[in-house]
Amino acid sequence: MKKYLDPKADLTFKKIFGEHEDLLISLLNALLPLKEDELVEEVEYLSPELVPDNYVGKNSIVDVRCKDIMGRQFLVEMQMLWTPAFQQRVLFNASKAFVRQLDKRRRYELLQPVYSLNLVNEVFMKDYPDEFIHNYNIVHDLHDDKLIKGLHFTFIELPKFKPQTIMEKKMAVLWLKFLTQIVAAVFVAQVAVLA
């Protein structure tokens, strides 16, 4: 009986997506709400550590950090347990990556978007039982078609995922099945063998 490492486990996740560009690109294109002309084509890995600018600043580390050929940054986190602080940490890390793009000689027009993809192995939005992908942007209070571009956040509640809930993105289904079912499938097979 073959045994697989849980792809959600910290080290396994970082090995898969932090060392294999093609897998990371596929994951980003499948799970982020990117239009056809916005798809990621190639990436350059960046240090996952966001070191503070001075000794009193807060150090932070993400699971995977990269940028594409357009200069957009992508932060990817796999979080096993939801805590209210996690959402704040995500905002902190994305904001830090965003503001660090410019030094005092560069113009604001050169800022590129930062996308934060957060896979959570716990249900945290119980009020929305049928929704498991949550996308956030900075939008106008009254006119949600008016947005300030720059920071985008995607949270995915893995336990809510059912393969039939996504129809338009086949790769999204495959990646989410990989993240949620590979270890469960092995466990079921082992129980069947023991029975």
Q: What does each model-identified segment do?
A:
Residues M1-A195:
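Elongated, amphipathic alpha-helical interaction scaffolds
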